[in-house]
């Protein structure tokens, strides 16, 4: 059955969301490979899974539909064309050589779709293939080397695709460790019965090509509503990516303006939503560094000829106030003294998921910031994050809204 897919804001009633429960991919994380796979530490996978279940159930108890990425991927593999396409793109002849790649694809094609989905996100080692598959490539690798690397960052479903008004951007990811995630989402949006044939726009990123420097990640994209989109230019999202998305939004008349803000290029400010989220009509949670007066900010609008008009803004807050038609933005800054605020920002105190105006989900460990939310009239539904938080992502990072009301 075709579902409605529309995201009209950051704060309207959330109705449907895609999550990814930690699985095999996190079990593959080790101290020697976690940096390459963009994690700072290894997690207790069982405990992270329990924490994620509490997160998912918190959403369900609020009447929100929760779809799990592994389920969607498993169901997508029931479509022969989708299965063939995924095997061809994820098991590349150019990576493994044509004969070995063919043998691996043939073997994978025979397993259950649940197991295949598990490997498409969790990776595959040489030790897991049958001894009957013989090849020079096998002979020259250690049994614990990866044929297909794991995708532990699938946990952060926000980044790989983002719904903006009546369409979706299927994002070309900046780091090699995440680029294969996009193919899993391309397949789901092309072939899964929930999405196939749906009347939604694919703004950007659906083609399996090299996007070079035009990278974009959903953690940098805030659909602030009223025809406006706020995008952070971070260590992951480039001005080139912003321009492609803005042009598509204007071409399809889905947005009237895109506000682009330059972010510091460091790990603690990986995406805009690690330092800023929209939690009520006039209220944002922020780490103060991002709203300094000297931060570069532009508003992009259509130039009337298929291009972009760029206007330098005096401040980010002024640009947001104009876009939303409000007199003054209310800011709730990260709580505690300077040391506590830095610690809580690192632990995703600002990375909350708004369920409806003034109601958010966030990690219970951020006691100083949660206290500030409470005093400001914002209700926090707390979830544990001692293990999940080690991945440097909070409730917003771990969720991809599929249906949300406008404002």
Swiss-Prot record:
Q: Tell me the route in metabolism or biology where this protein functions.
A: Amino-acid degradation; L-arginine degradation via ADI pathway; carbamoyl phosphate from L-arginine: step 1/2
Q: What class of enzyme is it?
A: hydrolase
InterPro entries in the cross-refs: Arg_deiminase
Q: Which UniProt keywords apply?
A: Arginine metabolism, Cytoplasm, Hydrolase
Q: What does the record give as the active site?
A: 397
The catalysed reaction is: L-arginine + H2O = L-citrulline + NH4(+)
Q: What is this protein called?
A: Arginine deiminase
Source organism of this protein record: Escherichia coli O81 (strain ED1a)
Per the record, the gene is arcA
């Amino acid at each position: 059955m075709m579902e409605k897919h529309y995201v009209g804001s950051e704060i309207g009633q959330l109705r449907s969301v895609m999550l990814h429960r930690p699985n095999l991919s996190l079990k593959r994380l080790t101290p020697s490979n976690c940096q390459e796979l963009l994690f700072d530490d290894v997690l207790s996978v069982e405990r992270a899974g329990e924490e994620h279940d509490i997160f998912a159930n918190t959403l369900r108890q609020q009447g929100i539909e929760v779809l799990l990425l592994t389920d969607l991927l498993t169901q997508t593999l029931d479509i022969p064309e989708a299965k063939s396409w995924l095997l061809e793109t994820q098991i590349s002849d150019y990576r493994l050589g044509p004969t070995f790649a063919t043998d691996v694809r043939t073997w994978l094609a025979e397993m259950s779709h649940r197991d295949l989905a598990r490997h498409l996100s969790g990776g595959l080692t040489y030790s897991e293939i049958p001894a009957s598959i013989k090849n020079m490539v096998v002979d020259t690798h250690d049994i614990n080397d990866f044929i297909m690397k794991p995708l532990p960052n699938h946990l952060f479903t926000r980044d790989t695709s983002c719904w903006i008004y009546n369409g979706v951007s299927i994002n070309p990811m900046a780091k090699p460790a995440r680029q294969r995630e996009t193919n899993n989402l391309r397949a789901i949006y092309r072939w899964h019965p929930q999405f196939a044939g749906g009347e939604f726009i694919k703004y950007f990123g659906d083609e399996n090509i090299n996007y070079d420097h035009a990278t974009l990640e959903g953690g940098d994209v805030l659909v602030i509503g009223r025809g406006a989109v706020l995008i952070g230019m971070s260590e992951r999202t480039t001005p080139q990516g912003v321009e492609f998305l803005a042009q598509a939004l204007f071409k399809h008349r889905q947005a009237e303006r895109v506000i682009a803000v330059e972010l510091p290029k460091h790990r603690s400010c990986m995406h805009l939503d690690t330092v800023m989220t929209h939690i009520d009509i006039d209220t944002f949670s922020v780490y103060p560094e991002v709203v300094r007066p000297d931060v570069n900010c532009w508003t992009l609008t259509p130039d009337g000829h298929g291009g972009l008009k760029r206007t330098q803004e005096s401040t980010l807050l002024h640009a947001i106030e104009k876009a939303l038609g409000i007199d003054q933005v209310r800011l709730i800054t990260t709580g505690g003294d300077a040391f506590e605020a830095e610690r809580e920002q690192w632990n995703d105190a600002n990375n909350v998921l708004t369920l409806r105006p003034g109601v958010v989900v966030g990690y219970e460990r951020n006691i100083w910031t949660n206290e500030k939310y409470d005093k400001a009239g914002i209700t926090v539904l707390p979830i544990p994050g001692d293990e999940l938080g080690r991945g440097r992502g909070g409730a917003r990072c771990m969720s991809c809204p599929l249906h949300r009301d406008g404002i």
